[in-house]
Amino acid sequence: MNSSPAAKPVDGALFDMDGLLLDTEIIYTRVSQEIVSRFGKTFDWSVKANMIGRPAIDSSRYLVETLNIPMSPEEYLAEREELLKRYLPQCQALPGAEQLIRHLRRHRVPIAIATSSSQELFAIKTRRHRPWIDLFDVVVTGDDPEIKSGKPAPDIFLVAASRLEVAPERALVFEDAPSGLQAGLDA
């Protein structure tokens, strides 16, 4: 007979941000499609699925090579950054995200954001959501000097757990991307 393993108590929660707390994926898709369409290419799920949750330079390299577009990953990133700064301030919270964070805060559960986004893009994305984003005890961004490797490496979740003063094995990770899920499991 298969029985579910007993639930283990947790001492803290670690959250990815893009596509989990904030609905930014639609904006990233729009921006990428806007760039690659100039070269007659399509940014579809087969490409996007391999980019979600990875550091920006790795994702950009994958896109440029896979779609064979005539620009360097750095050029793509620079153009993408400008477009993101225009569109990201309008991103919406995903349904239930704010309520969950407020619930955890009321129950004194330590919470952290562990996002691959840079500090600059984090600030742009969260500007409209500060009343509940500020409830997080810790925010770790992808450009944090302690992060040696991006997702799927566990670094970002290990740093977030450490700053929360929670043992990684006693933290619950909330993730939506395959690379992030692997990072959470490895942490």
What spans do the regions from the language model cover?
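Glycine-rich phosphate-binding loop signature in dinucleotide/nucleotide-binding domains
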Residues: 6-8, 106-109, 164-170
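Substrate-recognition "cap/lid" segment bordering the active-site pocket of phosphatases
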Residues: 90, 118-172, 178-186
